[in-house]
A protein has these predicted regions:
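Structural motif
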Residues: 52, 104-107, 129, 156
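Short Gly/Pro-enriched loop/turn and capping motifs at secondary-structure junctions
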Residues: 134-137, 160-163
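Core dinuclear metal-dependent hydrolase active-site scaffold
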Residues: 1-47, 57-127, 135-141
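Residues that line or immediately flank small-molecule/substrate-binding pockets and catalytic motifs
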Residues: 55, 132, 159
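Proline-aspartate-enriched helix->loop->beta-strand connector
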Residues: 48, 127, 143-160
Protein backbone atom coordinates (compact mmCIF):
# COMPACT_ATOMS: atom_id res chain seq x y z
CA UNK A 1 0.00 0.00 0.00
CA UNK A 2 1.36 3.41 -0.98
CA UNK A 3 0.40 6.12 1.51
CA UNK A 4 1.13 9.74 0.73
CA UNK A 5 0.77 11.41 4.12
CA UNK A 6 1.30 15.16 4.38
CA UNK A 7 0.19 15.61 7.98
CA UNK A 8 2.12 17.83 10.40
CA UNK A 9 1.51 17.79 14.16
CA UNK A 10 2.72 20.52 16.54
CA UNK A 11 2.28 20.65 20.31
CA UNK A 12 1.84 24.29 21.31
CA UNK A 13 1.87 23.79 25.10
CA UNK A 14 -0.74 22.66 27.61
CA UNK A 15 -3.31 20.60 25.75
CA UNK A 16 -3.06 22.73 22.59
CA UNK A 17 -2.21 20.84 19.42
CA UNK A 18 -2.06 22.12 15.84
CA UNK A 19 -2.58 19.63 13.03
CA UNK A 20 -2.08 20.47 9.37
CA UNK A 21 -3.60 17.83 7.12
CA UNK A 22 -4.04 17.66 3.38
CA UNK A 23 -6.75 15.04 2.78
CA UNK A 24 -7.44 16.39 -0.72
CA UNK A 25 -5.78 19.20 -2.69
CA UNK A 26 -6.13 21.82 0.05
CA UNK A 27 -4.47 22.03 3.47
CA UNK A 28 -6.75 22.00 6.49
CA UNK A 29 -5.43 23.59 9.70
CA UNK A 30 -6.99 22.15 12.86
CA UNK A 31 -6.31 23.44 16.35
CA UNK A 32 -7.37 21.49 19.42
CA UNK A 33 -7.74 23.34 22.73
CA UNK A 34 -6.42 26.79 21.77
CA UNK A 35 -6.75 28.07 25.35
CA UNK A 36 -4.85 30.97 26.87
CA UNK A 37 -2.31 29.48 29.28
CA UNK A 38 -2.36 30.57 32.92
CA UNK A 39 1.43 30.88 32.72
CA UNK A 40 3.99 30.91 29.96
CA UNK A 41 3.59 31.86 26.35
CA UNK A 42 1.26 30.79 23.59
CA UNK A 43 0.61 32.03 20.08
CA UNK A 44 -1.23 35.38 20.14
CA UNK A 45 -3.52 34.18 17.38
CA UNK A 46 -4.03 31.25 15.07
CA UNK A 47 -5.83 30.96 11.73
CA UNK A 48 -7.34 27.48 11.68
CA UNK A 49 -10.17 26.28 9.48
CA UNK A 50 -11.28 24.08 12.39
CA UNK A 51 -11.07 24.75 16.15
CA UNK A 52 -11.91 21.89 18.52
CA UNK A 53 -12.37 22.34 22.25
CA UNK A 54 -12.42 19.69 24.96
CA UNK A 55 -13.48 22.07 27.76
CA UNK A 56 -15.80 24.58 26.05
CA UNK A 57 -14.76 27.47 23.84
CA UNK A 58 -14.34 30.13 26.54
CA UNK A 59 -10.91 31.59 27.31
CA UNK A 60 -9.59 30.88 23.82
CA UNK A 61 -6.69 32.67 22.20
CA UNK A 62 -7.64 34.80 19.20
CA UNK A 63 -8.78 32.70 16.25
CA UNK A 64 -8.52 34.63 12.98
CA UNK A 65 -10.97 34.09 10.15
CA UNK A 66 -14.14 32.13 10.69
CA UNK A 67 -13.14 28.64 11.81
CA UNK A 68 -15.64 25.84 12.22
CA UNK A 69 -15.91 25.36 16.00
CA UNK A 70 -16.86 22.14 17.76
CA UNK A 71 -17.04 22.09 21.55
CA UNK A 72 -19.75 19.48 22.18
CA UNK A 73 -20.11 15.77 21.44
CA UNK A 74 -20.96 15.01 17.83
CA UNK A 75 -19.63 13.96 14.45
CA UNK A 76 -18.91 15.92 11.27
CA UNK A 77 -16.78 15.88 8.14
CA UNK A 78 -14.93 19.10 7.36
CA UNK A 79 -12.91 19.23 4.12
CA UNK A 80 -12.17 15.51 4.23
CA UNK A 81 -11.38 15.35 7.96
CA UNK A 82 -13.81 13.16 9.92
CA UNK A 83 -14.21 14.56 13.44
CA UNK A 84 -15.87 12.56 16.21
CA UNK A 85 -16.28 14.09 19.66
CA UNK A 86 -17.46 11.97 22.58
CA UNK A 87 -18.57 13.08 26.04
CA UNK A 88 -15.78 13.07 28.60
CA UNK A 89 -16.13 13.75 32.31
CA UNK A 90 -17.66 16.82 33.93
CA UNK A 91 -18.92 18.41 30.69
CA UNK A 92 -15.71 17.86 28.76
CA UNK A 93 -15.23 16.09 25.44
CA UNK A 94 -12.65 13.80 23.88
CA UNK A 95 -11.87 14.00 20.17
CA UNK A 96 -11.02 11.61 17.35
CA UNK A 97 -9.83 12.79 13.93
CA UNK A 98 -9.46 10.70 10.79
CA UNK A 99 -7.62 12.21 7.81
CA UNK A 100 -5.15 11.02 5.18
CA UNK A 101 -5.53 7.45 6.43
CA UNK A 102 -4.27 8.51 9.88
CA UNK A 103 -6.40 8.46 13.03
CA UNK A 104 -5.68 10.67 16.04
CA UNK A 105 -7.31 10.89 19.48
CA UNK A 106 -7.06 13.77 21.97
CA UNK A 107 -8.20 13.05 25.52
CA UNK A 108 -8.31 16.68 26.71
CA UNK A 109 -7.79 16.99 30.46
CA UNK A 110 -8.73 13.75 32.13
CA UNK A 111 -7.63 11.80 35.18
CA UNK A 112 -10.35 9.15 35.29
CA UNK A 113 -10.65 5.75 33.65
CA UNK A 114 -12.24 5.69 30.21
CA UNK A 115 -15.78 4.34 29.89
CA UNK A 116 -17.01 1.87 27.27
CA UNK A 117 -18.31 4.53 24.83
CA UNK A 118 -15.04 6.48 25.03
CA UNK A 119 -13.02 3.32 24.39
CA UNK A 120 -15.22 2.45 21.39
CA UNK A 121 -14.74 5.85 19.74
CA UNK A 122 -11.09 6.43 20.64
CA UNK A 123 -9.55 2.96 20.36
CA UNK A 124 -7.15 1.67 17.73
CA UNK A 125 -5.80 5.08 16.69
CA UNK A 126 -2.45 5.82 15.14
CA UNK A 127 -1.65 8.85 17.34
CA UNK A 128 -2.87 9.43 20.91
CA UNK A 129 -2.47 12.70 22.83
CA UNK A 130 -2.42 11.78 26.54
CA UNK A 131 -2.55 14.32 29.38
CA UNK A 132 0.03 13.28 31.94
CA UNK A 133 1.98 14.84 34.79
CA UNK A 134 -0.03 18.02 35.29
CA UNK A 135 -3.11 19.21 37.16
CA UNK A 136 -6.24 17.11 36.46
CA UNK A 137 -4.23 14.70 34.32
CA UNK A 138 -3.19 11.08 34.51
CA UNK A 139 -0.28 9.99 36.61
CA UNK A 140 2.18 7.65 34.88
CA UNK A 141 0.37 4.46 35.93
CA UNK A 142 -3.07 5.64 34.76
CA UNK A 143 -1.61 7.01 31.52
CA UNK A 144 -0.14 3.58 30.74
CA UNK A 145 -3.54 2.01 31.45
CA UNK A 146 -5.30 4.41 29.04
CA UNK A 147 -2.64 3.85 26.37
CA UNK A 148 -2.99 0.07 26.67
CA UNK A 149 -6.81 0.27 26.55
CA UNK A 150 -6.78 2.37 23.39
CA UNK A 151 -3.94 0.48 21.68
CA UNK A 152 -2.45 3.55 20.00
CA UNK A 153 0.64 3.24 17.84
CA UNK A 154 2.23 6.61 18.71
CA UNK A 155 1.84 8.38 22.06
CA UNK A 156 2.31 12.13 22.50
CA UNK A 157 2.21 13.39 26.11
CA UNK A 158 0.43 16.72 26.63
CA UNK A 159 -0.54 18.96 29.56
CA UNK A 160 2.72 18.28 31.38
CA UNK A 161 4.81 20.92 33.07
CA UNK A 162 7.24 22.36 30.55
CA UNK A 163 9.64 25.28 30.28
Amino acid sequence: MNLNINMHISWLGGTTVKIVAKPFDEEVVIVIDPYKPAEGTAPRSLSPQVALFTRGSGDSITLSGEPFILDTPGECDIKGVLITSVAGTEGQTMIRLDAEGVSLAHLGLVNKSLNQKQREVLSDVDVLFVPVGGVNTYDAEDAVKAVNELEARVIIPIAHQSD
